[in-house]
Amino acid sequence: SGGEKVRCMLSKIMMGKPNVLLIDEPTNHLDLEAITAFNNSLINFKGTVLLSTNDRAFAQSVANRIIEITPNGIIDSYLPFNEYIVNEKVLSSREKLYK
């Protein structure tokens, strides 16, 4: 299955002990057990992880910095996701950058 292939690929990558991971939508096609295991491995990962995700719960659990790319610039913030989405400074920046 697609999820099994993703799990194998992620396991193979993590065993190589990289210091940077660049991953796009890593939780797609994974079941809850695999997402939890991957989440825990990212929390313990000592390197840098750049990821794109639409999974808010996943972002909240692993991200300590959020960089939002907009049509007119970027918003770079060292906030957990749940604080990022309600932060007044971020909301003001988003309003300006999405016009």
Regions found by a protein language model. Name each.
Residues 1-99:
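ABC ATP-binding cassette signature C-motif
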